[in-house]
Amino acid sequence: MSSESPESVDDSTKVQATAEWDPLQAVRMHLPGAETFVGIMDPEPNLFLNDFSLVDAQQEHLSLSQDLEAALPASNPIHYLHDDLANGNGMNALLSSRVNFDLSELGEDEQVNRRDKMWARLHELSPHTQIQAVLGNAEVIRHHSHSDEEVPGSNPDRWDTTSVQLEQPLTNMYFQRDQQFVTQNGVVLCSMKEDTRKPEVDIARASWEALDGDEFDVDIVADMSQVREHDVTEHVPERDDIQETEVLVEGGDFYPAGEFSLLGVSAKIPEGEAYPKHDIAEDDTEYVHRTTYAAGHRLLMDDAFGSEEVGLVRAPFEAAQAHKDDDNGEVEMDIMHLDTWFNFVDDDLVVAHKELVENTTLDVYARTHGGEKPYTLERPDVNFGEYLREKGFEIVDVYDYVDPSHPDTDMALKAITNFLTVGPRKILPVRFSDDDDGVMKQFIDGIQEDYDVTVIPDGEGRKIINLRAGYGAIHCMTTPLRRTPE
């Protein structure tokens, strides 16, 4: 079966992505703000590697936006989350549901008057200021002054003080890949694994509803946040090794690839194996990283993908566990999503941790074309590397371009495949320094020289340090609005 991209629908406004190497025409991003500050103060519960500078992170993000603005051909290629919400009248409902004013210390008449003024002011603020309040789940608390002193002609509000409380803010919202993903058929809303990220899907839903209009035709083909359970064995009896798990899916696990699609799903655990540090018992048959097999199969039954084949790629937990040379308990973060160890460059070239690719499998589902179900399991437990070679892909091993003795090697391996492909053999990767001996330089130079790949900007990639504290890199920070053949 060819890996060439199918014809896109005859609708130049449809939100869709046909293949990861097809030209990117428009992309959505979110400039991190005050909501991210809480993650800087307390990194671990917010899924960050460590603390970082918010100001420097914002500068990095703006530079990244400028790179894409210059690289993409459309007149308005960069869509910011706050602008889409504001322009499509989606912001007001979020302000009402996620921002509150506590004026309980004021008198009853004062409360009504002040609340009306404060709400009116909130709705007049810039969209990015508003989205920070929304994502921060902000409560503004007015503390009444008990001073008896009165100054004729002064505003009595000047004597009060204010507190602002951010209640479990959505610190990871600048990783715009995970709350949703875009297929050939349309938009899939995800169901996040971590509690701290689950409400992000509500913001994503509002943003797509707001975007739907003259410029873009948005079709939400599945909302997995509304699905509580799915029994795989009811549809695929031969997959009786799939446990009853939550229906979880995150966008970093998905790639469109022309006539086929890939979705990373839970790891397959051999019978009798146990990993106590990861809460994997001997009777467990799968280990959930971020996306469950059940969610992948449910999306097949919902016909959400649109491609002729769909491969459910098992997370390479055992291979990653064996390869890890330190016991830091973070193996699941190293292979958190498919895009943390695999990516497409063109219709015949991928970059990957080759050892992981060669030591995991996928289940290949084929479209039935009028059958009782949209897809049926055609080939179970296919070696992932063999499948890619069948499709005509050469696998570039990241270890060919990373010096294992470099002090930043571990950091590089977490980000090296998380580049953004903006067109055939044209990528935007991350780098960590301007030095000639930087850990990413060998990869950036080598991929250009050995495989005729264009690296933007300026053949060097984008220097990102602070934004990387949240694990993800450039692929994680973007979601395509439209990616189709020229």
Curated annotation (Swiss-Prot):
**Which Gene3D superfamilies does UniProt cross-reference here?**
L-arginine/glycine Amidinotransferase, Chain A
Functional pathway: Amino-acid degradation; L-arginine degradation via ADI pathway; carbamoyl phosphate from L-arginine: step 1/2
Any one Gene Ontology BP term: arginine deiminase pathway
Q: Which Pfam families match?
A: ADI
Under Enzyme Commission nomenclature, its number is 3.5.3.6
Induction or repression: No induction in fermentatively grown cells.
Q: Does the keyword Cytoplasm apply?
A: yes
Identify the domain of life.
Archaea
Catalytic activity, as annotated:
L-arginine + H2O = L-citrulline + NH4(+)
What GO molecular function annotations does the UniProt record carry, in alphabetical order?
arginine deiminase activity
One cellular component term (GO) for this entry is: cytoplasm
Subcellular location, record wording:
Cytoplasm
Active site (catalytic residues):
C476
Q: Which UniProt keywords apply?
A: Arginine metabolism, Cytoplasm, Hydrolase, Plasmid
State if Hydrolase is listed as a keyword: yes
Physiological role: Involved in the arginine deiminase pathway of fermentative arginine utilization.
Which family is this sequence assigned to? Belongs to the arginine deiminase family.
| The protein's name | Arginine deiminase
